[in-house]
């Protein structure tokens, strides 16, 4: 069984080829989280797009809970976590923006994102098993190279921030969908967690469908089968 489950804010759980991947695992301080931290026992890979607290989240504690889990982020961010929080180097999957990294039957890649980040460049994350490809854009504004991300990785699903202020708003995210051209659906994330990023997600859904693409609006805790 393969699925995408939204855990509120930018936290997303992906089950693919027998692996359990969690991206940007903000759980404890996430008012929309439908789960407690112990739900993440048994994860295979923890992906982090950048070092802002609402994306770095509970990564250190999750890695301690799961000694066999691997961290996937830019090497600079990984080494910050090694030096600052004593994350074991054995738990790292070193990478930077570029091509796929093969890991136990799945493929992982980092992409460009336009945002800020103190210890490393911000990124998006691509997860694929060769049959299904998911693109999590991280925190980002709209940028023209999204066309290249779509061309190179050809994602089936695009998870895009729509909350505005710190990232794209719904209107800009619709433009992003038209550049990325997801083969199956676009899914909005990073909205309505707090008042500062409160928007109407139906604006995104309608805009995406008007462009001829599918949009799936998940509630926190909801999942879709891939």
Swiss-Prot record:
It comes from the Archaea. Disulfide bonds: none annotated. Pfam families: Lactamase_B_2 (PF12706). One of its GO terms (molecular function) is hydrolase activity. The keyword Hydrolase applies. Keywords: Hydrolase. The keyword Oxidoreductase does not apply. InterPro entries: Metallo-B-lactamas, RibonucZ/Hydroxyglut_hydro, UPF0173, UPF0173_UPF0282_UlaG_hydrolase. Belongs to the UPF0173 family. This is UPF0173 metal-dependent hydrolase Msed_2125. It comes from Metallosphaera sedula (strain ATCC 51363 / DSM 5348 / JCM 9185 / NBRC 15509 / TH2). The lineage of its organism: Archaea, Thermoproteota, Thermoprotei, Sulfolobales, Sulfolobaceae.
